[in-house]
């Protein structure tokens, strides 16, 4: 009388002889498909390995499991500076991102015409790297791949814009600071400027933090460490409080990835820190200095915010 949902992690690799066979993985997925168990997938795109024709083949292979397989995301490989002795991967560049987006958007049209949903999605990072406009909200199929960094920025924009439309605005005086990763910085800057149109006396200092701990190629806020945050914000104007996204901390803890704590940051920077939940309404409320009654809908993921 109920349909069981089970999460499986199936690695599909076919570019190295000493790792799992893609045929074996597809056979396992075939069993899930025949059992009617819903699936969602992720492809980590590595330039020169599984892009181009290989990406087309992957999408085609996984697409035959539709509609039981509901979606797949394509995300760029994340490379830290700690790669001595590892396979010589290179980071995804602008041209790589452009090609991947073009491929994925062609496939989206095919799947939408056949099934009524887009199935394959490029992560937000591809659009930022390519310098392209984010897809419209409808193309995210209800944000089914949100936890893999697909649609986070679009959802944030939509939620903040909705909160802005519902706000009356006033002349309250307030000075705050916001720290984030380099990837979401321009979007948060634009949204903050929008908020300040109705609250012109709110002054916001916005700081994109460079990730020296893991490497400058890591640009998401969820992998920023306490030492990078403190080192780059020390001596900067921070106002009456510093806003940090919840995903900058370990889940359920006030601890950064490098074991520094919220209290360490407050003590070093001499400013109260407000950990902001994930939704656009939470962000809006934090900027204007309001707390909303009841629980807010929040989501967490390290990829973007």
PLM regions: where:
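Hydrophobic alpha-helical scaffolding
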Residues: 45-48, 90-97, 178-181, 219, ...
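Short acidic, glycine/serine/threonine-rich loops at helix termini
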Residues: 16-17, 53-55, 83-88, 132-135
């Amino acid at each position: 009388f109920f349909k069981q949902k089970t999460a499986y992690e199936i690695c599909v690799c076919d570019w190295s002889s000493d790792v799992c066979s893609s045929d074996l993985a597809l056979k396992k997925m075939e069993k899930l498909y025949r059992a009617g168990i819903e699936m969602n997938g992720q492809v980590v795109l590595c330039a020169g390995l599984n892009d181009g024709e290989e990406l087309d083949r992957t999408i085609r292979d996984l697409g035959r499991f539709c509609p039981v397989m509901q979606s797949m995301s394509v995300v760029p490989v994340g490379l830290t500076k700690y790669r001595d002795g590892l396979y010589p991967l290179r980071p995804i560049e602008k041209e790589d991102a452009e090609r991947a987006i073009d491929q994925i958007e062609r496939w989206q049209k095919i799947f939408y015409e056949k099934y009524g949903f887009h199935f394959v999605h490029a992560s937000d990072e591809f659009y930022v790297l390519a310098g392209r406009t984010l897809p419209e909200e409808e193309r995210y199929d209800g944000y089914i791949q949100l936890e893999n960094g697909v649609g986070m920025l679009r959802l944030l924009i939509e939620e903040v814009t909705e909160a802005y439309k519902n706000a009356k605005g006033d002349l309250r005086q307030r000075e705050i600071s916001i720290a984030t990763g380099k990837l979401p910085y321009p979007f948060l800057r634009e949204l903050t400027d929008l908020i300040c149109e109705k609250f012109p006396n709110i002054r916001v200092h916005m700081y994109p933090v460079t990730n020296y701990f893991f490497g400058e190629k890591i640009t998401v806020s969820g992998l920023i460490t306490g030492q990078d945050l403190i080192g780059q914000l020390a001596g900067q104007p921070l106002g009456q409080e510093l806003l940090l996204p919840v995903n900058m901390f370990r889940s359920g803890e006030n601890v950064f990835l490098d074991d520094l704590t919220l209290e360490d940051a407050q003590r070093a920077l001499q400013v109260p820190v407000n950990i902001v939940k994930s939704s656009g309404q939470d962000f809006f409320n934090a900027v204007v200095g309001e707390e909303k009654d009841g629980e807010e809908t929040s989501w967490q993921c390290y990829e973007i915010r």
